[in-house]
Regions:
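Polyanion-binding surfaces on beta-sheet-dominated domains and ring/shell assemblies
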Residues: 1-145
């Protein structure tokens, strides 16, 4: 595992800083078979971090497309609940398909929403700074946990 950008740059460590909350305490190491480990912050902790810093903020998700076997969801992050649609600080889409997996296969809509939310929060600075310097991020990691 390479050096964390969070540890290498004081500016990155100060991004969205909340006194008394250290996101690294909630991060975990994950890896796919045959790949190097990466540090990852689950979406539930990204949401917690966002709520601690922005108690009047909001996260809005919209179903863009939904069929029997596929869902596309958009998520937008706002610093204040009164912000207009175009004033989001993070925005992302995610697509998921129904699978044969007995635990998560039918939860493709929920997984798409979680992925879109995680990516939108990362876009707003809640999680991306934990990426290892020089490593590519796997977009499917937003579903972990």
């Amino acid at each position: 595992m390479t050096e964390l950008l969070y540890n290498k740059s004081k500016a990155v460590a100060a991004l969205n800083k909340v006194e008394g909350f250290n996101p690294l305490e909630f991060a975990r190491r994950i890896s796919n078979e045959g790949e190097a480990e990466q540090l990852y912050l689950d979406v539930k902790y990204r949401k917690l971090w966002f709520r601690l810093l922005n108690p009047t903020g909001k996260i809005i998700s919209n179903i863009i497309s939904l069929t029997e076997n596929m869902a596309v969801v958009e998520a937008r992050v706002y610093l204040d609940k009164c912000d207009q649609k175009e004033d989001c600080v993070g925005n992302s889409y995610a697509q998921r398909f129904r699978t044969a997996d007995p635990k998560f296969g039918d939860k493709f809509l929920e997984l798409a929403e979680t992925a879109a939310t995680g990516r939108a929060l990362a876009d707003a600075g809640y999680g991306v700074q934990f990426a290892d310097v020089g490593e590519e991020n796997d977009p499917l990691q937003v579903d972990a946990g």
